[in-house]
């Protein structure tokens, strides 16, 4: 770790010296979705559940074309998976993609270290069997960790060119900041005619597609790293009647466009079991989350209301504009992994699209 703390275990996957931001995920399942989630770009992920890999990897469970993590840390790695859809082991899959795995260490102690000291940078390094690192080697790893910078994250994972997924329903533009596949599947399952555009798209380029609604997707890194996206959302908001739905990083970018600020959390929210309270109804939702930043509630303008809060730390988990057709959530309604109860938010978005279309026709 960048503070000099050393955790030793057995190396699997690809041999490497790999630096990244070390974070932890509290999910019991869904490791394939985690490693292929573009929001984890540049991160070394510690799984707190003690046994990982027991159902292998499947052809259907990936959330993108490849793993995006810099490394995986587990207590116990199962190398003989059992599942009727498995096409291989997690270890072989990550090894083929150049991702190292560190297993056999005390992940509880590592997680408590991160909770106490905050998210920090670290290095996964493999040595020949039986070799022990000397002080000079450890010092070199510490310097490698401290030198790591997460730069150009969104650009690295987002689409470089627009593409369309035809459908019979309303025209929806999804701005890709690192979208998980299931966001697009949820939209197309509801009949949407989806056009996915790069994160660098301007408001003019988005509007030229004549969208009836816009989805701002999830993605990696800090929202302040994509100022061009903030300007794009401001341009969309200036239309006054275009429905917008922000998810995770998209939620944060929308908040910046509305004049709010964001800040980095001590150790983030990552897992499939985070309770969130919907303030209007008092209902509690169990949500899938993966974010290291949050919107500062005190920075929100009067026309924006907080709709959801985390029951863990009270941070903002949802926003809505009092006048414009915009709402956002910090968590992942598409799940994958995690509970599916929050998919109703896609229906809420499409209801907003329908109401906006009716208003336009009758204006």
UniProtKB/Swiss-Prot annotation:
Which InterPro entries has this protein been placed in? Anth_synth/Amidotransfase, CarbamoylP_synth_ssu, CarbamoylP_synth_ssu_N, CarbP_synth_ssu_N_sf, Class_I_gatase-like, CPSase_GATase1, GATASE
The UniProt entry annotates the active site at 248 (nucleophile), 332, 334
A Pfam family for this UniProt protein? GATase
Q: What class of enzyme is it?
A: ligase
Q: Where is this region: CPSase?
A: 1-171
Cite the Gene3D superfamilies for this sequence. 3.40.50.880, Carbamoyl-phosphate synthase small subunit, N-terminal domain (3.50.30.20)
What CDD domains does this protein map onto?
Answer: GATase1_CPSase
Q: What does this protein do?
A: Small subunit of the glutamine-dependent carbamoyl phosphate synthetase (CPSase). CPSase catalyzes the formation of carbamoyl phosphate from the ammonia moiety of glutamine, carbonate, and phosphate donated by ATP, constituting the first step of 2 biosynthetic pathways, one leading to arginine and/or urea and the other to pyrimidine nucleotides. The small subunit (glutamine amidotransferase) binds and cleaves glutamine to supply the large subunit with the substrate ammonia.
Provide the protein name. Answer: Carbamoyl phosphate synthase small chain
What lineage is on file? Answer: Bacteria, Bacillati, Bacillota, Clostridia, Eubacteriales
Q: Which gene encodes it?
A: carA
């Amino acid at each position: 770790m960048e503070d000099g703390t050393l955790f030793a275990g057995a190396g699997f996957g690809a041999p490497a010296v790999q630096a990244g931001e070390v974070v932890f995920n509290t999910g019991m399942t869904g490791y394939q979705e985690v490693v292929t989630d573009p929001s984890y770009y540049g991160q070394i992920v510690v799984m707190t559940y003690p046994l990982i890999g027991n159902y292998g990897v499947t052809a259907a469970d990936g959330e993108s074309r490849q793993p995006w993590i810099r490394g995986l840390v587990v207590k116990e790695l199962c190398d003989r998976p059992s599942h009727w859809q498995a096409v291989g082991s997690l270890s072989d899959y990550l090894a083929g993609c150049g991702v190292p795995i560190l297993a056999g260490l005390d992940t509880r102690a590592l997680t408590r270290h991160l909770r106490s000291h905050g998210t920090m940078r670290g290095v996964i390094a493999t040595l020949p069997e039986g070799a022990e690192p000397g002080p000079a080697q450890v010092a070199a790893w510490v310097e490698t960790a401290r030198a790591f910078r997460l730069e150009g994250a969104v650009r690295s994972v987002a689409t470089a060119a627009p593409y369309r997924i035809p459908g019979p329903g309303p025209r929806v533009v999804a701005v890709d900041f690192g979208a998980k596949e299931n966001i697009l599947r949820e939209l197309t399952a509801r009949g949407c005619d989806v056009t996915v555009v790069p994160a660098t798209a301007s408001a003019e380029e988005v509007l030229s597609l004549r969208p009836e609604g816009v989805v701002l997707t999830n993605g990696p890194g800090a929202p302040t790293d994509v100022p061009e996206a903030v300007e794009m959302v401001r341009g969309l908001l200036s239309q006054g009647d275009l429905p917008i739905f922000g998810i995770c990083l998209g939620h944060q970018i929308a908040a910046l466009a509305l004049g709010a600020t964001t800040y980095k959390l001590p150790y983030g929210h990552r897992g499939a079991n985070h309770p969130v309270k919907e303030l209007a109804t008092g209902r509690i939702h169990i949500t899938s989350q993966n974010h290291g930043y949050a919107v500062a509630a005190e920075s929100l303008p009067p026309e924006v209301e907080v709709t959801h809060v985390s029951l863990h730390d009270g941070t903002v988990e949802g926003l809505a504009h009092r006048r414009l057709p915009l709402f956002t959530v910090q968590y992942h309604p598409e799940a994958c992994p995690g509970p599916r109860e929050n998919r109703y938010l896609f229906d809420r978005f499409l209801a907003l699209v329908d109401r906006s279309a009716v208003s336009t026709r009758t204006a």
